Every structure is written in C-alpha cells, then in structure tokens.
Amino acid sequence: MSVLSEFKAFAVKGNVVDLAVGVIIGGAFGKIVESLVGDVIMPIVSKIFGGLDFSNYFIPLAGQTATTLVEAKKAGAVLAYGSFITVAINFMILAFIIFMMIKQINRLQSAPAPAPAPAEPPPPAEDIVLLREIRDSLKR
C-alpha cells in the first residue's frame, strides 16, 4: 500500500472528519464566548466595580507613564494582567459550557434501556392443576 493511499484511508476515517468538524465549530464557538465575555459579562463586572475597564489594567515594567495599554506596549514591556483576567473568564465560561455539553451527551448515551415487560409466569404443571381440582372438589 502506498503512502498516498494510506494517507487517503486515514484522512477519510470517521474520527478524522469528526475531529475536523469539531475544530471548526470550536473555533466559531470560541468567538461567540469571546464576544459574550467582552461585550456582555465584562461590562456588567465593570459596572459593578465602578466602571473599571479590565482590558486596560497593566503594570509598566520599564517605568513608562502611559495611560492606556496600547501606549504602554509601544513604550516598553508591560504586565497586562487585565487582559489575562478577561482571557481567564473566557476560559472558565468555555470550560463550563463544554462540561455541561459533555455531561448531557453522556447522560443521553448512558440512558438505560427500558426494562422489558415482565414475562407471564409459566402455567402450572398438570399434576398441580389436578391436585387443585381435587382439593376444590373436596372443599364442596
């Protein structure tokens, strides 16, 4: 088998195609989460903490006196911990959403099959039926 045909067989396997689809959807989903955090959650957090903009939180490492992160990065090295806070919140939200999705998938996959209806008990043996008839006739 040639290398090209082996690669073709590998590339069209279900797992590889599923992985490719997952990566593409994951990239798009990451952008959704990034927008959720940047455009919805962080403004609310900023409002709660008095109008703070976490993206501009930094510590200058070169002694510069810039007022924004962009200016500080142009002037020298900075420790941009505000950006890190935003990325950490992105990660926590994304990890939680993925955890909930996997939890639901596992619940659906491991749903127990419905229990079969109980089978009717087998009819009693002929000698038991005969003995019951004799007993019933003696009671009368």
From Swiss-Prot:
Keyword Ion transport attached: yes
Compartment(s) of residence: Cell inner membrane
InterPro entries registered for this protein in UniProt: Mechanosensitive_channel_CS (IPR019823), MS_channel (IPR001185), MSC/AndL (IPR037673), MscL_channel (IPR036019)
Subunit structure as annotated in this protein's UniProt entry: Homopentamer.
Protein name as catalogued: Large-conductance mechanosensitive channel
NCBIfam families given in the database record: mscL, PRK00567.1-4, PRK13952.1
Superkingdom per UniProt: Bacteria
Any single GO CC term annotated in Swiss-Prot or TrEMBL for this entry: plasma membrane
Residues that span the membrane, as ranges: 21-41, 82-102
Bilayer disposition of the protein: Multi-pass membrane protein
Known function: Channel that opens in response to stretch forces in the membrane lipid bilayer. May participate in the regulation of osmotic pressure changes within the cell.
Principal location listed in the UniProt entry: membrane
A Pfam family that the UniProt record links to this protein: MscL
Keywords annotated in UniProt: Cell inner membrane, Cell membrane, Ion channel, Ion transport, Membrane, Transmembrane, Transmembrane helix, Transport
A GO MF term: mechanosensitive monoatomic ion channel activity
Keyword match ATP-binding: no
Family: Belongs to the MscL family.
